[in-house]
UniProtKB/Swiss-Prot annotation:
Protein's organism: Helicobacter pylori (strain J99 / ATCC 700824) (Campylobacter pylori J99)
Gene: dapE
Family per record: Belongs to the peptidase M20A family. DapE subfamily.
Lineage, uppermost ranks: Bacteria, Pseudomonadati, Campylobacterota, Epsilonproteobacteria, Campylobacterales
GO molecular function, one term: metal ion binding
Binding site for Zn(2+) 1: H84, D115, E175
NCBIfam families reported in the protein's UniProt record: dapE_proteo (TIGR01246), PRK13009.1 (NF009557)
Protein name from the UniProt record: Succinyl-diaminopimelate desuccinylase
Length: 388
């Protein structure tokens, strides 16, 4: 089965987060030779398929056991394709049923075509066509909760794999990373994300007696240039400068003759490795010195980076250039993804997938040529890793 046929089938399942709708049974049916692990919690389902190709024979393992570095010698390279089968709600005004895929003018239309059932379909097809000659462990990790909170999705599945000593060495998450043409972008990392709530305190009172009030909005005006849209560091070759962005402001009771007793500022900082929750706290404490305030900070994800010269990145680059005739840009732009959970376990991880011009949009679609090329790239990566 090719990537197009598999992707069409995947799109036909209305897997709006966290619904799985039986899609895992279909996927399992494609891989009868793979072992299966499943994990379900709080309505979220996760699937892990794996197969050891050309396993080391027992007598060889005994010989390896005599060697100093037994662990590295006995275990074959473990590579994992990862992704999510859940999609966001389709909304209205589609030209066709979002869960009845159609082909029109060289494109496959349907919810999830780009994000990310197209990528999943491509790596499933590549996995079916992979036949290495050396010992190699190939796995596939899928979750029904990436578009949602993600608490019981990939993160939980990786914890289970750690318990079973089945964590991969390398992984590609098939997120739609490309901007204009397939192959123009690889995500080799992601910025971290810190959410915050700042409350500046004042004294509520009658607007006609300002001398008896202390308006916190006046206080905010004096420090706003130092907390709105400011760069927290200079970035580096892999990351843009970390930036503090205000997302919401709230003050007052809704009455025109009452000054507020406080003003609440919600903000987010997307940050590089140069900025941490502690350094952000220190910066704000310095800016807000001597002012009455309360501050809450919470990190929702940590930044990570996979070296541009790593084995996985190099093999992926080589196959993109060979198949797509494009030199990919290595970057860390965009929001958070499940790749961060792999990185937290020390797994070498990158993201690569379809063009992202219609993700989460009406009439989402992926070109048929993209699916064909994406499958070839993924198969080339498998073959390249198994030969090196």
């Amino acid at each position: 089965m090719d990537a197009l046929e598999i992707t069409q089938k995947l799109i036909s399942y209305p897997t709006i987060t966290p619904k799985e709708c039986g899609i895992f049974e279909y996927i399992k049916s494609l891989f009868p030779a793979f072992k299966t692990l499943e994990c379900e919690k709080n309505g979220v389902k996760n699937l892990f398929l794996y197969r050891i190709f050309n396993p080391l024979k027992k007598h060889a393992e005994k010989e390896h056991a005599k060697e100093k570095h037994v662990k590295e010698n006995v275990k074959p390279l473990h590579f994992c394709f990862a992704g999510h089968i859940d999609v966001v709600p389709p909304g209205n005004n589609w030209q066709s049923d979002p869960f009845k895929p159609i082909i029109k003018e060289g494109f496959l239309y349907g919810r999830g075509a780009q994000d990310m059932k197209g990528g999943v379909g491509a790596f499933l097809s590549a996995s079916l066509n992979f036949n290495p000659k050396t010992p190699f462990l190939l796995s596939i990790l899928l979750t029904s909760d990436e578009e949602g909170p993600g608490i019981f999705g990939t993160r939980l599945m990786l914890e289970k794999l750690k318990e079973k000593d089945l964590l991969p060495h390398m992984a590609i998450v098939a997120e739609p990373t490309c901007e204009k043409v397939l192959g123009d972008s690889i995500k080799i990392g992601r910025r971290g994300s810190i959410n915050g709530k700042l409350i500046l305190k004042g004294v509520q009172g009658h607007v006609a007696y300002p001398q008896k009030c202390q308006n916190p909005i006046d206080t905010l005006a004096s420090v706003l240039p130092l907390i709105s849209g400011v760069h927290l560091d200079n970035g580096d070759e892999c990351f843009d400068p970390s930036k503090l962005v205000i997302t919401n402001l709230h003050a007052g009771l809704g009455a025109n003759n009452v000054t507020p007793g406080s003003v609440e500022i919600a903000f987010n900082a997307r940050h590089s490795l140069k900025t941490t929750q502690e350094s952000l706290k220190e910066y704000l404490e310095k800016v807000l010195k001597d002012l009455p305030y309360t501050l809450e900070l919470e990190s929702s994800s940590s930044p990570f980076i996979t070296a541009s010269h790593s084995k996985l990145t190099s093999v992926l680059q080589e196959n993109i250039l060979k198949t797509c005739h494009t030199t990919p840009l290595l970057n860390t732009k965009g929001g958070t993804s499940d790749a961060r959970f792999f990185s937290a376990h020390g797994i070498e991880v990158v993201e690569f997938g379809a063009i992202n011009d219609r993700i989460h949009a009406v009439d989402e679609r992926v070109s048929l040529k993209e699916l064909e090329l994406l499958e070839k790239v993924f198969l080339g990566v498998l073959e390249g890793l198994s030969e090196k």
